[in-house]
Amino acid sequence: MRDFKTYLSVAPVLSTLSLGFFAGFLIEINRFFPDALTFPFFSF
């Protein structure tokens, strides 16, 4: 039962960290390329 509680407590921590990292990544991209629907280095 203790291992099951440990397993259930790992998923929220990992999802919070991964979503926080992804949100920070998007914020930094929008800081360098504001309002970019297509990135400048992908346009030909």
Curated annotation (Swiss-Prot):
Keyword check for Transmembrane: yes
Superkingdom of source: Eukaryota
**Chief location:** plastid
GO biological process terms, alphabetically, are: photosynthesis
Among InterPro entries, the record links this protein to: PSI_PsaJ (IPR002615), PSI_PsaJ_sf (IPR036062)
Ranges annotated as spanning the membrane: 7-27
Q: Which UniProt keywords apply?
A: Membrane, Photosynthesis, Photosystem I, Plastid, Transmembrane, Transmembrane helix
Could you tell me where this protein is found in the cell? Plastid membrane
Gene3D superfamilies reported for this sequence: Single helix bin (1.20.5.510)
Protein's membrane topology:
Single-pass membrane protein
Gene Ontology terms: cellular component: photosystem I; plastid membrane; thylakoid membrane
Family membership, please give it. Belongs to the PsaJ family.
Known function? May help in the organization of the PsaE and PsaF subunits.
| Protein name, as recorded | Photosystem I reaction center subunit IX
Which gene produces this protein?
A: psaJ
